[in-house]
């Protein structure tokens, strides 16, 4: 093991991850590049089609609603047919959405349908990701596995920026199209289709994990039962959902809801914000997102060490609280390089807490409740994005670009502060520090 590897504990533990965990990380890298391309370029594509910012916000809201409606059914289904099947189904839905979007042209109804289908597929994958990793990792390696997976998500942002900003433009130029025109976005969609096909193929290599499949004896000795333990109340619960401690559930998901409301006003539309304020072209804009993702990768990989030093809860509170001043700079600085720096540091700090929070949350509930918690977290996040997206659209329609974004940034700062304070207060003293 090299000194660099020792400095990044997630990478040092990679060889000790389960075979399926390593395959899942590979699938995350491949399909995650397609997902990142969607988040970076989808709104820009709609703007290139001539849609107003308020209309783009409504498309985002409808997509969030579709994701919200998918989360609990996907969670319940995964308990019956296995996480792998739901992962594959989500990838198939995403692939179908891309094909539909490519064929849609400027038909708004078809575009909305494609966005909804994509969001549904993405949510199906999201709600089973944390339970799948928890069920394919040993307790002493869980923080590292979650950290590496989150870091991979940000590596894919860098890959996506290169594919979207350089490769797609070069391909479009070679074919005689305008590198800044609609054809380049359609090349990006084609690249996404290829990535999703490869990602789906990787998912099919995962071992069968339907309920009849048992966990390894070693995990059972460590107190980790089968991935799908039988709960005598499950048959009586609505949609197969079992929640033993509702108060704890609320405390785990409410901070995320507040962040979701704030994030829904800004994060999906950061590409439009940066482009509109500074006039960047497609390649430059993708480059900005690549730079911001790089710092996040490093921060996420060192977060397990922070968790061991300060404890899971304290480390999450520290990095999230430190990110808030950079939100202020991001929203209100008139200088491009300070906005890029603020975006990079803010992303690094805020996202660095995500893998540790996910691991912490999975450990706060019984094994049979993990998928339910993941679904509840996803649903409340998506509901937050619905409210946030509606508020964004209203502000853009009523106040215009500058004042509308100013109100949105003030709101996200207040909500992030409240969320961080509540999480720290409710869970002070909880969580592992080793």
Residues covered by each model-derived region:
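Juxtamembrane intracellular "pre-TM" segments in multi-pass secondary transporters
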Residues: 2-18, 208-254
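A membrane-interface helix-boundary motif in multi-pass transporters
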Residues: 169-193, 394-416
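Helix-to-loop junctions at the C-terminal end of transmembrane segments
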Residues: 70-82, 168, 299-312, 396-397
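Central cavity-lining transmembrane alpha-helices of secondary-active solute carriers
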Residues: 58-75, 290-302
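Hydrophobic core of transmembrane alpha-helices in multi-pass small-molecule transporters
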Residues: 29, 97, 108-125, 257, ...
């Amino acid at each position: 093991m090299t000194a660099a590897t020792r400095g990044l504990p997630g990478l040092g533990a990679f060889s000790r991850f389960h075979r399926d965990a390593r395959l899942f990380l590979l699938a995350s890298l491949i399909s995650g590049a397609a997902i990142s391309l969607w988040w970076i370029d989808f709104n820009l594509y709609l703007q290139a089609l001539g849609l107003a910012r308020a209309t783009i916000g409504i498309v985002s809201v409808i997509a969030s609603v579709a994701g919200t409606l998918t989360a609990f059914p996907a969670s319940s289904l995964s308990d019956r047919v296995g996480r792998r099947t739901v992962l594959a189904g989500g990838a198939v839905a995403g692939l179908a959405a891309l094909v539909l979007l490519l064929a849609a042209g400027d038909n708004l109804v078809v575009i909305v349908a494609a966005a909804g289908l994509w969001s549904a597929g993405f949510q199906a994958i999201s709600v089973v990701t944390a339970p799948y990793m928890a069920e394919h990792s040993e307790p002493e390696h869980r923080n590292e596995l979650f950290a590496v997976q989150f870091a991979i998500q940000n590596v894919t942002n860098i890959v996506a920026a290169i594919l979207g900003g350089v490769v797609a433009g070069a391909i479009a130029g070679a074919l005689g199209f305008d590198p800044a025109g609609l054809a380049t976005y359609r090349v990006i969609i084609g690249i996404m289709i290829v990535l999703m096909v490869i990602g789906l193929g990787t998912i099919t290599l995962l071992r069968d994990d339907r309920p009849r499949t048992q966990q390894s004896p070693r995990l059972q000795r460590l107190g980790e039962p089968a991935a799908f333990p039988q709960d005598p109340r499950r048959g009586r619960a609505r949609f197969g959902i079992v929640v033993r401690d509702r108060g704890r559930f609320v405390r785990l998901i409410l901070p995320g809801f507040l962040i979701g409301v704030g994030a829904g006003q800004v994060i999906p539309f950061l590409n439009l914000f940066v482009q509109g304020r500074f006039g960047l072209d497609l390649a430059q804009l993708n480059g900005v997102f690549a730079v911001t993702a790089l710092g996040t990768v490093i921060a996420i990989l060192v977060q397990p060490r922070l968790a061991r030093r300060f404890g899971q809860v304290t480390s999450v509170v520290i990095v999230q609280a430190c990110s808030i001043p950079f939100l202020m700079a991001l929203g209100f600085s008139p200088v491009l390089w300070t906005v890029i720096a603020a975006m990079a540091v803010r992303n690094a700090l805020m996202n660095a807490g995500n893998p540790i929070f996910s691991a912490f949350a999975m450990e706060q509930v019984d094994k049979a409740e993990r998928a339910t918690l993941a679904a509840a977290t996803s649903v409340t996040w998506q509901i937050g994005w619905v409210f946030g997206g509606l508020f964004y659209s209203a502000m853009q329609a009523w106040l215009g670009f500058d004042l509308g974004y100013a109100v949105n940034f003030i709101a996200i700062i207040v909500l992030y502060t409240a969320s961080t304070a509540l999480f720290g207060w409710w869970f002070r003293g909880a969580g592992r520090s080793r």
